[in-house]
Amino acid sequence: MKHVTRPLFAAAVAATFALCGPAQAQGLKGAPAPFDKGGVKIAAVSFLGAGDWLQAFEAGVKRQADALGVKLTLSQARNDNDTQRNLIQQAINLRVDGIIINNGRPEVLKDIAQKALDAGIKVVAYDVNLDNPKIPQIEQSDADMARLVLEQAVKDKGKGFTGGAVYVAGFAPLDRRYAVWKEFAGKYGLKEKAVWGVVNDTVPASVADQTKAVLRANPDIAVVFTPWGEFAKGVKLAIDELGVSKKVKIYGVDISTADIQLMTEPDSAWMATAATNAAVVGEVAVRAVSLAIAGQFPGRSVMLKPTLVTRDDLLKNKIATIEDLQKKFSAFQKSDAATAAWIPAGK
């Protein structure tokens, strides 16, 4: 595990927080306290530090925060546990009103999240189970996403196919999605030949190297389940380099404009994915923590429903971007999760 020296960390945090604009001084008309007066501060702390999904998530966070007139801070731990804890502590020290924790490891975050609660700060978590009744969990039904895409894999390839999965244990969404893969393996007689994966700053490149070795050693693999978009990118890169796109197919989770472009390339191996709109997830996270700040607890679980998107769907509908997808698939436009009459829509 890498460690960040205090001077470098301080500089990084200062730069991150300097990006934030002023909160809306006049407040929101008709909103409950403290939003009626303005000056509300929210911090969104992400475990990841790169990728199309994170970019879209943060865009959604910013869009909804702007609509609420919130002073927002965005920070990324770049896959480092210590840095994520430090960023949350920094948010506590700044006396923000709410913290959004985006991904991470539960065993690393439970105590620091409780520390925020003890300081009177509202906390919501996305894709990391902090097992705390006071912390709403923003969830995109990981099990449903995995089931949707694996049902498509069985439909396309039939029962009993030989496959592999890219998976790293200890991340709640990956754990839940991989559990469904194991469920399907038992139910449909799927043969799991290999499991591989890594979470670092260069996921696609690292996974590509691993995948090439796996596919060379296991030429009978016909399907690769990728429970994260960055994994899928790496697997596709490996398949393309090995020239086996007609033989090995990818069934994944998550979607972005870059993913759509990869799925619609000629002879692409990426056949289907199941996802929610990352930008909508970001909007919901801000609404959920805002409700908590206003004393309107959004519930222990705030659920977003996923949608299956196949390569055929994209090609037939001439979909090239997330914006195109939103026009064709209404589920990608918005969510009614964690809403209230006083919360304006993000623009």
Where are these regions (language model features)?
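Bacterial N-terminal signal peptides that target proteins for export
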Residues: 1-11
